[in-house]
Amino acid sequence: MSLKRRLLLIARLAGRNAAPIALAIALFGMGPAPALAQDDAMTPIRTPAQPEAIPLGTPPLPDAKVPESWHSQYGSVFARNVTEATLTPFLPDPAKATGAAVIVAPGGGFRSLSMENEGWDVARALADRGVAAFVLKYRLNQTPADLEGFGRSIREMLAGPRPPRQPDAAEAAASLAPQLEDARAAFALVRSRADEWNVDPDRIGMIGFSAGAMLTMVTTLAGEDARPAFIADIYGPLSPVKVPADAPPLFVALAADDGLFAGSGFGLIESWRAAGRPVEFHFYERGGHGFGMYPKDTTSTGWFEAYVSWLRMHGLLQAKAG
């Protein structure tokens, strides 16, 4: 699927009443925190050293010619034009390891990845709680190499019409086929090295942010052999879905002032409840879109501790007996 169609798909998932500026913020990977406003300019940076990153072996997107590049913004770092998917392990101290694992999918509208705020920082915090975490750097649609052209291309996409209807699950999976392939490869890799990484192959979950939440949901509903044991949707779309009888426990966090996804109802939550599957939903008064691990003066900052408490409630912070 073309970049334009992908962005329009995301726009449609956001709902007809989503403000264009909110959509632009989401597609750039985050909502600007007031304390970080001085860092809102995109600045090119060298590609960070990633010695622990493991190539997943999935092929580059067709006609992908622009090389991977990185930039800083809002005090975080972002990757663009990713053509080689990787998985980076963040393993806990063996003495603290619970056997649970989480694959972390950053957001960024499928044309950038918020690698720090929604990736590495999340993984480090999970590892500190005894959970093995793996940051998925999935393949992205190509955008112009220069940041000015990148920004211009997004503005042009946002000016286009929106799709006439919400895509069904099969269409969503087809539109994200390369990213879904990366997610499936990530689950396969973790399971293949479960003994080495002290991971219980039956306790591997996934957490996604914004676009990464979309990928998490598609992986859950159409990922075949991925089979996440538990999932978290952090400020992703809450459109209703067809929930399978064996759907995993779901954790959701969203801010009421999220201009992208807070105005379209809570269909996802209702779908999980109607199917009789476990779901926990935190709806914060303020936080905007893209709060991630940023320190903010809003209660949305508490989402991670709430998530950890949820993991504990499901027995995932204790090693499995026997």
Where are these regions (language model features)?
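Primarily recognizes the serine-hydrolase "nucleophile elbow" in alpha/beta-hydrolase
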Residues: 178-246
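N-terminal cap/lid segment of alpha/beta-hydrolase-fold proteins
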Residues: 40-94
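Short amphipathic alpha-helix adjacent to the substrate-entry channel of hydrolases
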Residues: 117-134
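Conserved alpha/beta-hydrolase "acid-adjacent" motif
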Residues: 259-264
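Alpha/beta-hydrolase active-site loop
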Residues: 151-194
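Short beta-strand/loop motif that positions the catalytic acidic residue
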Residues: 252-254
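C-terminal catalytic histidine-bearing segment of alpha/beta-hydrolase fold enzymes
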Residues: 278-322
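Short beta-strand element of the alpha/beta-hydrolase
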Residues: 99-107
